[in-house]
């Protein structure tokens, strides 16, 4: 399976526990945090892991990829993200399909569960994932204001690769004061 670094860093998953149905995860490790000429991460969809946890069926303790600098386990520990493996993720997916989203926790063995599970829907997830200040990328004849509601880095890259000056603003920013040719409102949680 490819794409777990991108999925884990996708702001759209903020506050959620990600349950992956592909049977083997971790086999190619995690790439470096390098940035491109625009100051955008080359390998991730944002600056950090946004999920609150990861549930997988089988974890590969050995990884192999020319671009890997650490294991998935090391990366998740660095960012204090809990994970669990050895779980029938396809059965969980069936339950979610039939019943809709559910609250949940990943609890270390021997520890007690919290009496009340935090509901991430009570938090303003867009405020959590949005940039906190205006950020400019690239240069060009056309200027586009991007309202950041949880934008992925690949969307930023798509604009600047096409010669657009991109002005990324927080979700609650008064962009009407700016000079721009186009407006893009990103997706998010």
Regions found by a protein language model. Name each.
Residues 1-172, 178, 187:
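RNA-binding accessory domains that recognize and position tRNA/RNA substrates
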Residues 184:
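N-terminal Rossmann-like NAD(P) cofactor-binding module of classical short-chain dehydrogenase/reductase
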């Amino acid at each position: 399976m490819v794409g777990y670094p991108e999925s884990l860093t996708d702001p759209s998953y903020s506050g959620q526990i990600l349950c992956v149905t592909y049977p083997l995860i971790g086999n190619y490790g995690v790439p470096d945090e390098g940035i491109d000429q625009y100051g955008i991460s080359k390998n991730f969809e944002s600056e950090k892991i946004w999920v609150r946890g990861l549930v997988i069926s089988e974890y590969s303790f050995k990884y192999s990829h020319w671009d890997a600098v650490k294991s998935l386990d090391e990366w998740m520990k660095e960012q204090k993200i809990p994970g669990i493996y050895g779980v029938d993720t396809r059965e969980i997916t069936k339950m979610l399909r039939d019943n809709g989203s559910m609250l949940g926790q990943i609890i270390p063995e021997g520890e007690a569960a919290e009496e009340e599970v935090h509901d991430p829907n009570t938090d303003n997830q867009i405020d959590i994932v949005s940039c906190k200040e205006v950020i400019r990328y690239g240069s060009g004849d056309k200027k586009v204001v991007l309202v950041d509601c949880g934008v992925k880095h690949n969307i930023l890259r798509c604009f600047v690769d096409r010669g657009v000056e991109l002005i990324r603003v927080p979700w609650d920013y008064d962009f009407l004061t700016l000079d721009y040719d186009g407006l893009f409102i990103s997706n998010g949680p």
